[in-house]
Amino acid sequence: MRRLLLAAALAAAAALPASAQQAAGPSTILNVSYDISRELYQAVNTAFVKQWKAKTGQDLTVNQSHAGSSRQARAIIEGLEADVVTFNQVTDVQVLHDKGNLVAADWQKRLPNNASPYYSLPAFLVRAGNPKNIRNWDDLVRDDVKLVFPNPKTSGNARYTYLAAYAFAKEKLGSEEKADAFVRKLFANVPVFDTGGRAATTTFVEREVGDVLITFEAETNGIRDQYPGKFQVVVPEVSLLAEFPVAAVDKVVDKRGSRATATAYLDFLYTPEGQDILAKFHNRVHNPEVVSHYKEQFPPVRLVTVEEAFGGWDRINKEHLASGAKLDQLFEKR
C-alpha cells in the first residue's frame, strides 16, 4: 500500500507544471540588506511576492534584515542565514567569498552590470534655504560647517563618502598629502559618528544635529519628500559611482533549497517593473525606458569610478580599508 501511495505521489508531482514544481522550495527567504533600504525592499517584496504567487501558486514571505552593510556581511560570515544579499558596496559581497566561501568567485558575472541592478552617489542634504551655502565638497571642510554621516568603519554608505571626498581632494589639490589633510578636516567636522545610515539620518533630521547630511542621493531625496519644505538636496559637481551589488548566498540557498526563489528574486530587480520601483525610490537604474521616464528626477553629475580614482576595490582594500591603512590613520588623527 505504501508503495502505491508513493508511486501516486511521484506521478502527481511529475504531472505538475514546472513553475509549480519550482515553488516546492521553502516559503520564506531572507534578504539581508544595507541600513537605509527598508522602504525600498518592502515595495520590491510586495511586487515580487505577487508575481511569484501568480507564477508558481506559492505564498512566499520575503523577510528583511537591515544594518550597516559591513556589519551585515560579518553577521552572515558568523552564521546569519541570508538567502540573498543586497548591499551597497562590492567589498561586502566579496568578503563572503574571501572569508566564508559563501558565495561563488564569479558572483559579479552572474547578473548584468556587475550584479548591480541600480546605483547612486554620495550627495548632500541641507536645511531649507541652504543657510551655509553648500555647493561642493570643499564647502564641507569649512570651520563653520558641521557634518553628519555614519562611521566609515561600519557603514558602506560612509565609506563611499570617504572615498568620494578623497577622490575629489586628490584631483583638485594634486597630492595625497593634501587629500589626507582634507579628509582629516572632513572627519573633524563630524560631531557624532553613528553606526549606520539610518541612524545618521535620525541624528540630522530628528535631533537636528549638523548642517549637512552626507548620504546616498536616493536617501536625500526620500527625506526631502518625507519632510516637505524642511530640506533640500545638493548634488555636487562630481561624485563617486556607488554600485549596489546583489547576490544569492550559495551555501545557504543550496542548504535550504531556495536557489530558484532567490535567483528569481534577484532577476526581478532587472525587470521593467523592478527597475521602475527602484527609480521611484530615487535610485539611478539601467533600463533605458525607465531612465527616460525619470530623467527629470536626476540632475547631471560627473561620476568617477573606483577604478578611475583608486585602481579598483582590491587596491582600496589594501591601501585604504584594511586594518591600520589610510582610513584608520586619518580617522584616528581627526
Residue ranges of model-derived segments:
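Short, low-complexity disordered leader/linker segments with a strong preference
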Residues: 1-28
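Early extracytoplasmic/lumenal segment of secretory-pathway proteins
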Residues: 20-99, 109-111, 216
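Alpha-to-beta junction loops
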Residues: 79-85, 144-146, 207-212
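A conserved helix-loop-strand patch within extracytoplasmic ligand-binding domains
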Residues: 97-171
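Short beta-strand->loop
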Residues: 107-116, 138, 224-240
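A bilobed periplasmic-binding-protein/Venus flytrap-type ligand-binding module shared by bacterial periplasmic
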Residues: 122-130, 243-260, 277-281
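Ligand-binding pocket segment of bilobal, Venus flytrap-like solute-binding proteins
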Residues: 172-237
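Extracellular/periplasmic juxtamembrane helices and adjacent flexible linkers that interface
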Residues: 253-334
